[in-house]
């Protein structure tokens, strides 16, 4: 009975790792693929992480061009967790925009991003690599990142995928 449980656990770990493994090759982005900006309330659950995982898989296949990720939750853990994911999937160059005065998830009863960011190895080092160095509060404001990314693209050529709130989108529409 014990061996069969260990075997099943091993199979489960193998199955899960194959779903979230790093990309095996660098994808070539073709000019006709959709250009995407992800708007996310990443932090208190895993739906956003799964959506981001799917976008990385589309990037790997060359099916999209992910221009940036904007976060609409207050605090450093959502941005740090997004940096961990960008690094894990080998896309550290994807810019991250943050929001101030957004929804506060730092003290949520369930804060998935915080839990992952605080995992440490036995030697006290973070368990997951990050690409960005320094204070995550110094990342560009999401509306400013939107304006920058959208200004670099032809009109009507970018799709914004929103998972959660749309806090950073609103100021972009009212700003010059």
For each feature predicted by the language model, list its residue ranges.
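Bacterial N-terminal signal peptides that target proteins for export
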Residues: 1-8
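C-terminal motif of bacterial Sec signal peptides marking the signal peptidase cleavage site
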Residues: 16-18
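N-terminal acidic, glycine/proline-rich low-complexity segments
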Residues: 20-176
């Amino acid at each position: 009975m014990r061996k069969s449980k260990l075997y099943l656990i091993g199979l489960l770990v193998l199955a899960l790792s194959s779903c979230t493994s790093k990309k095996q090759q660098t994808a070539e982005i073709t000019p006709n693929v959709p250009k995407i900006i992800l708007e996310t309330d990443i932090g208190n659950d895993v739906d956003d992480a799964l959506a981001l995982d799917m976008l990385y898989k589309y990037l790997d296949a060359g099916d999209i061009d992910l221009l940036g990720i904007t976060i609409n939750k207050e605090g450093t853990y959502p941005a740090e967790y997004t940096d961990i994911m960008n690094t894990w999937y080998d896309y550290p160059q994807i810019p991250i925009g943050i929001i101030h005065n957004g929804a506060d998830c730092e003290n949520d009863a369930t804060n998935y991003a915080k839990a992952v960011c605080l995992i440490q190895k036995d030697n006290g080092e973070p368990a997951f690599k990050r690409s960005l160095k320094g204070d995550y509060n110094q990342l560009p404001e999401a509306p400013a990142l939107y304006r920058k990314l959208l200004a670099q693209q032809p009109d009507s050529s970018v799709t914004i995928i929103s998972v959660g709130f749309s806090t950073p989108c609103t100021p972009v529409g009212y700003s010059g």
